[in-house]
Amino acid sequence: MNKTILWSFLLFFSGSQTSRATDQKIADFAVDLYKAISLSHKNNIIFSPLGTTMLLGMVQLGAKGKAQQQILKTLRMRGTPAGEEFSVLKSLFSAISKKKQEFTFNLASALYLQEGFIVKETYLHSNKEFFQSATKLVDFLDAKTSAQAISTWVESKTDGKIKNMFSEEEFGPLTRLVLVNAIYFKGDWKQKFRKEDTEMTDFTKKDGSTVKVPMMKALLRAQYGYFSQSSMTCQVLELPYKADEFSLVIILPTEDTSIEEVENQVTAPHVRRWFSELHEEEVEVSLPRFKIEQKLDLKEALYSLNVTEIFSGGCDLSGITDSSEVYVSRVMQKVFFEINEDGSEAAASTGINIPAIMSLTQTQFLANHPFLFILKHIRTESILFMGKVTDPDIQTTKGRDLDSL
């Protein structure tokens, strides 16, 4: 892969260093991928656009012809100005690593290839340099050993938070190349919730039934907005994490707007507008405590976004290996994400206790029904996670993007 295209890919991650058009591509791909995944996932969803882009970048490093062009088109990178030798991806990870004491962010990415194929040295070097990713050979014919080896590697890279990522049933004699992405994040709120204020409250699910969930409550100074367009009306709240490196943006449909209406109508311009037009005010926040662990095979979602060639026999991955028998078998991502009251005892400020009788004039943000969320890196506005909560009581979901295929 030539350096011009490589630098174009790296510039894809830029927030402050490149044009506004580059920023837009990040949100564009995130929303596209969310819609593709949500076609078959009607309940809780979480995925990482950043992680998925890294996986596609790892393939693109060694792809040529149609395979490469499909990835470029899906990421909206065709025609991206090139020539600036500055890796924003490296900058992002550098920024994260400098403040590790403030939060936990573990991202493990790897390319696993069937033993017997020879990986080119240039690819090994570039994959490690630009994506901090491992390239490993395994024998997928020994499915049990391969599953154990990959799962153990993922567990070690995520401080034990993501376990048992693979089972032997997921590999077979036709498995050639598997892309693996595992991500864990946990941060301390800049303004934490008081645990003594959390109480069991009804959460109304999409079907109208209710479930009791632990609802965190606090009076916070937060970035807030109320947006109405066509039949989509929602409240948007941004809660920063300690050190102002990351923030959680929650998109809460009003009671007369369903989560499906938001999913159908939301676009990248909506997301960018939400990011830019929030204003600070005092908000009475009620947010359910939840934990989501989700494993996705992104193959079908990428298929629906017209990334198809890399999954076909005979695709040109000659930048990785000279063999014409190599193609991508699976694109696997597993994310562990948790929202709770916890914050740093020493430095984090605390939300104010909400009185039993709330002010009628106070802005209220009551997340007691399904909502979307985005975890972003504040400086670059890179979207690390995107998802939805339809039932905070469900903690673990697994499956393929299109179970019918």
Curated annotation (Swiss-Prot):
SUPFAM superfamilies: Serpins. The record marks 357-358 as: Reactive bond. It comes from the Eukaryota. GO terms for cellular component: collagen-containing extracellular matrix; extracellular space. It is found in: Secreted. PANTHER family: SERINE PROTEASE INHIBITOR, SERPIN, SERPIN I2. This is Serpin I2. InterPro entries: Serpin_CS, Serpin_dom, Serpin_fam, Serpin_sf, Serpin_sf_1, Serpin_sf_2. GO terms for molecular function: serine-type endopeptidase inhibitor activity. It comes from Mus musculus. Pfam families: Serpin (PF00079). Expressed in pancreas. Residues 1-18 form the signal peptide. Glycans are attached at residue 306. Keywords: Glycoprotein, Protease inhibitor, Secreted, Serine protease inhibitor, Signal.
